[in-house]
Amino acid sequence: MERSQCGSRDRGVSGRPHLAPGLVVAAPPPPSPALPVPSGMQVPPAFLRPPSLFLRAAAAAAAAAAATSGSGGCPPAPGLESGVGAVGCGYPRTPKCARCRNHGVVSALKGHKRFCRWRDCACAKCTLIAERQRVMAAQVALRRQQAQEESEARGLQRLLCSGLSWPPGGRASGGGGRAENPQSTGGPAAGAALGLGALRQASGSATPAFEVFQQDYPEEKQEQKESKCESCQNGQEELISKSHQLYLGSSSRSNGVIGKQSIGSSISEYSNKPDSILSPHPGEQSGGEESPRSLSSSDLESGNESEWVKDLTATKASLPTVSSRPRDPLDILTKIFPNYRRSRLEGILRFCKGDVVQAIEQVLNGKEHKPDNRNLANSEELENTAFQRASSFSLAGIGFGTLGNKSAFSPLQTTSASYGGDSSLYGVNPRVGISPLRLAYSSAGRGLSGFMSPYLTPGLVPTLPFRPALDYAFSGMIRDSSYLSSKDSITCGRLYFRPNQDNP
């Protein structure tokens, strides 16, 4: 009775709504007994078949809305969604929080989700609502994915249909297709029917077009691969020819005909195996050195040109070094030191027992040896002492040079006969009380002035006339400053060696 009154009032106020002809239901199906519809509303048939889960939630919402609204306004129809009843009665429906409704509280859902009192409730009703929400969210996501896939399939079908219609008719078929569009805009329903019919016709002819396109595509791809492989091989041949020319130029000076034969063999190997870059020297792989990695066809197809260009440049850089034979150490020394006599360099090399690096160090350090039969006994001692530059430091205002040496015992002697004598090194006076080991192993300017300063005051050591800031050129010889003052000018610049060495 209430339904008929509400329907008559709606009909009197607003009349029958004017809908588009495509949306009007010509013969509505009989409503289900669980879903009565007001007689004054025209509803699409898809809206009349909601899922049962949605119906139960709508019934609960309608009951809650009826309890809160009281007798004001038109009560919603029992069993119908509250949104439909609200639209029919003229006021919009605001969504409510289902968890609050389970606990007897009505609260609007907008901005309420974070501050809901029962957001973490685990009762039976709230868990049921959470499960329903999860199922609904999964359904919505699935429908969105299906709609997206359908739209993509339609776009692909349109592309295939346009690809089919262009080659035979050319522009005319395209123009005809554009001319058919105005006919399809006569009405919404007619346009939809024409669109569906065209899609059905296109779906029937879409598979052969796609097959033809798929057959043509591998041929084009194969042609592209072959052209890329040919260009890559041409580039490799050019680079390898350049590297062989460089190698030929370097090996013609050293090896002559042998280099040409190795180049010919490597070129023949490369022509036999064009898919990979071989090393120009077959013996290089057996010798233990790493050969450049071979290029597979997948690298050539994928366009990895940068890697094989790097490999080719590396092989080109290593070609001259590999081709060079072991050189004579004496030739190396003569090329490094062209101003030195060959016999002199040969003596230094013999003294260093054939070690080129040690011989170069000896020449650079200024150690020139002229070994004779008389000095063979002293050669081992001379080998142990390295001639290094002495670093100068000051002790309580007195500057003298520390004697840098590999051996701690040879540079300093503490005998009393050494003071003032010209047959030995200028030793430190025993009065000073300095251990020669500490003086020899001490570093310049780090800790010597601290432990030496109490002993080297002018009052304690008045008899050590060290020359300030002396810079000794060699560790095996030293200038006698006290002896220089008493000798004449001929012996002033004389250098005193140890007793076991010959004076120059």
From Swiss-Prot:
Q: Which CDD domains does the protein's record reference? A: CUE_DMA_DMRTA1 (cd14417)
Per the record, the major location class is: nucleus
For region Disordered, the annotated ranges are: 1-27, 170-192, 266-307
Q: Which Gene3D superfamilies match?
A: DM DNA-binding domain
The record's account of tissue expression is:
Expressed in liver, kidney, pancreas, prostate and weakly detected in testis and ovary.
Which intervals hold domain DMA? 327-362
What is the official name of this protein in its record? Doublesex- and mab-3-related transcription factor A1
Gene this protein is translated from: DMRTA1
